[in-house]
């Protein structure tokens, strides 16, 4: 049984890592080193495949060829735990497109949801919004943080 922290990454985390093959992102490195348990769902994998192969994304990130996207996914997916049939446990009125990430974090009993999306996701950690109060009350075990905070917290937890 894996006792490492469980994590859900939003789409932008994957996009940044796949688009810049010359750098190993700390978030992905933690997965590859087995320091965290990456949680994914078929819905998120499908979205990721779609985003990584969009012409406008490839135009912005020329290094992100279809072959590079395939290699990235083929390397990452065997290291992830796939959760099927994730129920809709929480409604995200600000952006329903982000609901699969929140609901996966809930279903996977993740410790972290890592995102750059302050407007639609990290606000759920704030007590000055009704959504934040509801989320924190119902799911206190999930921390929604940005990548630098996540990497720092995991690295600190690994210190002797």
What is the predicted function of each stretch?
Residues 21-24, 29, 53-54, 127-130, ...:
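Short, glycine/charged-enriched secondary-structure capping and boundary segments
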Residues 99, 108, 112, 119-160:
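Acidic, PIN/NYN-like endoribonuclease modules and their adjacent C-terminal/linker elements
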Residues 14-17, 62, 88-94:
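Short, flexible loop segments at the rims of nucleotide/cofactor-binding pockets, characterized by
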Residues 77-119, 123-126:
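Active-site neighborhoods of divalent-metal-dependent phosphate/nucleic-acid chemistry enzymes
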Residues 30, 104, 136:
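Hydrophobic/aromatic ligand-binding patch that stacks against planar heteroaromatic rings
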Residues 1-40:
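Short, well-structured N-terminal submotif of metal-dependent ribonuclease cores
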